[in-house]
Swiss-Prot record:
<dbReference type="GO" id="GO:0016887">
    <property type="term" value="F:ATP hydrolysis activity"/>
</dbReference>
<feature type="modified residue" description="Phosphothreonine; by autocatalysis">
    <location>
        <position position="173"/>
    </location>
</feature>
<dbReference type="GO" id="GO:0051082">
    <property type="term" value="F:unfolded protein binding"/>
</dbReference>
<dbReference type="Pfam" id="PF00012">
    <property type="entry name" value="HSP70"/>
</dbReference>
<feature type="compositionally biased region" description="Low complexity">
    <location>
        <begin position="579"/>
        <end position="592"/>
    </location>
</feature>
<dbReference type="GO" id="GO:0005524">
    <property type="term" value="F:ATP binding"/>
</dbReference>
<protein>
    <recommendedName>
        <fullName>Chaperone protein DnaK</fullName>
    </recommendedName>
</protein>
<feature type="region of interest" description="Disordered">
    <location>
        <begin position="579"/>
        <end position="598"/>
    </location>
</feature>
<keyword id="KW-0597">Phosphoprotein</keyword>
<dbReference type="InterPro" id="IPR013126">
    <property type="entry name" value="Hsp_70_fam"/>
</dbReference>
<dbReference type="GO" id="GO:0031072">
    <property type="term" value="F:heat shock protein binding"/>
</dbReference>
<dbReference type="InterPro" id="IPR029047">
    <property type="entry name" value="HSP70_peptide-bd_sf"/>
</dbReference>
<keyword id="KW-0346">Stress response</keyword>
<dbReference type="GO" id="GO:0140662">
    <property type="term" value="F:ATP-dependent protein folding chaperone"/>
</dbReference>
<keyword id="KW-0547">Nucleotide-binding</keyword>
<dbReference type="InterPro" id="IPR018181">
    <property type="entry name" value="Heat_shock_70_CS"/>
</dbReference>
<dbReference type="InterPro" id="IPR043129">
    <property type="entry name" value="ATPase_NBD"/>
</dbReference>
Length: 611
């Protein structure tokens, strides 16, 4: 069975891993880094992903970051006259990770396990699955990030019974999950979180502070200057990381703006204490879901065996201190917070292929599911933290006499009124036979699969008429839309590959021109002048083709020049060999003569021993 790769599709960074020799291994990207920034840039119809895209974000307005925050919504971003959905942008990142995996494994990759925040709702999960399909991947399983982290952590500790809390603070989302590990079973007991809280928010409080300080000093609002804002974002992210290791850092941004007197510079020292003061509210926001998860699990903090930190933002000292204070446990530092989720996804891939045996993963649904009933009340059918996959049915009836149809309004959330919860979808069960209110028996069944994706069906028990819906939220893409995006993604991948080949061809041609100049110089006076002239002529023809940017002509002229240079190089090599041979012969004769001239006659003296 082909390999199933594990992908952590993050808000700020993404990571890909695979099972090798019974161990999950992170696959480095072409630059040799183990994580790839989740950044996509468009420049002259070329798409760039990762570090190269992030580096030019200051000067390129067509750079898209943190798109994961918009998954499952109808958000679109316009780039070069075309609208892109979050699924399409995510698919470009996934294609990049897929290519890294294929280069590493030396084989085509078609299957993946992709992780999502535990608190992602149905629409966000469906959008992630669609992104995988657009990227040319069969998404074998969607799993929750904290659960994946626990899988990677617990793979070697299956014989120990443990209660663990996974605290996952990423770039844009926050999750906390409580799990029990025993005999190879990883059972999620409860989960809670906040999909609008992460490292980006910690960057933002620094940006706001810098903007306020600069405005106070210069009366100029940098938040209105797009290029200045991107420089501030980069500086804030760097300062945040610096303050995990040092107690103060210098932020220096020369020529950030200009006033009447000339250019203005931003110079500021940010202390860890000030950063902790600015971000105290964000740290506190992580503790409420932590308490809720513990309460839902029915555990006291003292019952926990381990606290595992996941996500780059957990390197912030104030975050570590807060979770230590809340649980009374020193956080476990034995996992890499940037890589552990991808490693866990690879383990799940190994479970699905049969490479990893004796592991059973029992996950839960993060939010309650139900329908709207009379008076706008939200009636729950499946409570949050129910182990998935699961199915639940309940019988409802009509609210009016002779009602010909019922509207089924499917919702997800925890609030008592429908209006306060997230709408997943609506559908109708029609052609009900006339009957007084309360008589028709309508059975509504919810199914949640192992990916946490919802299917709902309604059945009139009197007529056996049935209507089903796989939830398509307002952002949900139809099969036709996904198929169109798949084709566009493939076409773009082909175009990107073609562009890469064109660049490589031009580079090779430039290199050959340089090499020809060197060979011609070395051969001056050593070979027939006509041969040198032939090489020079072919080189000039190639240079002319490069200037015209005619690819087929470049290819033909390059091949012709390559042959001439090869022949000249052989001659140069032969001459060097001949010269070396002559020099060796002359040296040998010289050594022989020297030996002859320097012969010393031995002198003997007879010594008579006294006896």
């Amino acid at each position: 069975m082909s390999k199933i790769i594990g992908i952590d599709l993050g808000t700020t960074n993404s990571c890909v891993a695979v099972m090798e020799g019974g161990e999950p291994k992170v696959i480095p990207n072409p630059e040799g880094n183990r994580t790839t920034p989740s950044v996509v840039a468009f420049k002259n119809e070329e798409r760039q992903v990762g570090e190269v895209a992030k580096r030019q974000a200051i000067t390129n307005p067509n750079t898209i970051m943190s798109v994961k925050r918009h998954m499952g919504t109808d958000y679109k971003v316009e780039v070069e006259g075309k609208d892109y959905t979050p699924q399409e942008i995510s698919a470009i990142i996934l294609q990049n990770l897929k290519a890294s995996a294929e280069a590493y494994l030396g084989e085509t990759v078609t299957k993946a396990v992709i992780t999502v925040p535990a608190y992602f709702n149905d629409a966000e999960r469906q959008a992630t699955k669609d992104a995988g399909r657009i990227a040319g991947l069969e998404v074998e399983r969607i799993i929750n990030e904290p659960t994946a982290a626990a899988l990677a952590y617990g793979l070697e500790k299956q014989d120990e019974e443990q209660k663990i809390l996974v605290y996952d603070l990423g770039g844009g989302t926050f999750d906390v999950s409580i799990l029990e590990l025993a005999d190879g079973t990883f059972e999620v007991i409860s989960t809670a979180g906040d999909n609008r809280l992460g490292g980006d928010d910690f960057d933002q409080v620094i940006i706001d502070h810098l903007v306020a300080e600069f405005k106070k000093e210069n009366n100029i609002d940098l938040s209105q200057d797009k290029m200045a804002l991107q420089r501030l974002k980069d500086a804030a992210e760097k300062a945040k990381k610096d303050l995990s290791g040092v107690t103060q850092t210098q932020i220096s941004l020369p020529f950030i703006s200009a006033g009447a007197a000339g250019p203005l510079h931003l110079e500021l020292t940010l202390t860890r204490a000030k950063f902790e003061e600015l971000s105290a509210g964000l740290v506190e926001r992580t503790l409420e879901p932590t308490r809720r998860a513990l309460k839902d699990a029915g555990f006291a903090p003292s019952e926990l065996d381990k606290v595992i930190l996941v996500g780059g933002s957990t390197r912030i000292p104030a975050v570590q201190e807060a979770i230590k204070r809340e649980t009374g446990k020193e956080p476990y530092k034995g996992v890499n917070p940037d890589e552990v989720v991808a490693l866990g996804a690879a383990v799940q891939g190994g479970v699905l292929t049969g490479d990893v045996e004796g592991v059973l993963l029992l996950d839960v649904t993060p939010l309650s599911l139900g329908i709207e009933t009379m008076g706008g009340v939200f009636t729950k059918l499946i409570e949050r933290n129910t182990t998935i996959p699961t199915s639940k049915s309940q019988v409802f009836s009509t609210a009016a006499d002779n009602q010909p149809a019922v509207d089924i309004h499917v919702l997800q959330g925890e609030r008592p009124m429908s209006a306060d919860n997230k709408t997943l979808g609506r559908f109708q069960l029609t052609d009900l036979p006339p009957a007084p209110r309360g008589i028709p028996q309508i059975e509504v069944t919810f199914d949640i699969d192992a990916n946490g994706i919802v299917n709902v069906r309604a059945k009139d028990l009197g007529t056996s008429k049935e209507q089903a819906i796989t939830i398509q939220s307002s952002s949900g893409l139809s099969d036709e839309e996904v198929e169109r995006m798949v084709q566009e993604a493939e076409a773009n991948a082909d175009a990107d590959q073609k562009r890469k080949e064109e660049v490589e061809l031009r580079n090779e041609a430039d290199q050959l021109v340089f090499q020809t100049d060197k060979v011609v110089k070395d051969l001056e006076g050593k070979v027939d002048a006509a041969e040198v002239a032939k090489a020079t002529e072919a080189k000039e023809a190639l240079q002319a083709a490069i200037e015209k940017n005619e690819l087929e002509e470049i290819r033909a002229k390059k091949d012709a020049l390559q042959e001439i240079v090869q022949q000249l190089t052989v001659k140069l090599y032969e001459q060097a060999q001949a010269a070396a041979g002559q020099a060796e012969g002359a040296q040998g004769a010289q050594d022989a003569g020297a030996k002859k001239d320097n012969v010393v006659d031995a002198e003997f003296e007879e010594v008579k021993e006294d006896k």
